[in-house]
Amino acid sequence: MFENIMVPSDGSKHSDKALDIAIEIAKKFNSKITAVYILDESTNLFYDSLENEGNEILKKISKKGKKEGVMIIEHLITGDPLRDMEIIAKKTQVDSIVINSKGKDNSQNIMIGSITDRIIKTFEIPIVLVK
C-alpha cells in the first residue's frame, strides 16, 4: 500500500492540501504520485482554455513533487472523471487515493465534491479524504 498514490486535482486550494498530504505520505513510504487532471467531456465548450489550465496545474504539481523529492506522473485526459480515473488507476496500478472533499467553489456537491462521493462508493482501494 502507498506505492502509487493517485491525486486528482482541479487546481483549488483544497486539491493543493490533498497534494501536500499525498507528498508527505509518499516521502514516508518512498512512493510515487499519479497526478490526474480530467477535462470533463461535458465541458467541451471551453476545451482549449481548460486544457491549458490542466497543463499548468500538472506542471505546478510536478514542480512541487520534484522540490520534495517525490516522483510525479502526470495524466491529463478528456472524458468522464470517474470512469477515466478507474482506467488510469488500473493501468498505473494505483493502490491508494488522496482526494479533497470539496470542489473549487467550496461546495461538496459540485464537480470534485460529487466525484469524491462516487469515488468513495466505487473504488476498493484505500482512500484518504482531505477536508
Predicted features and spans:
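Small/aliphatic-rich secondary-structure junction motif
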Residues: 3-48
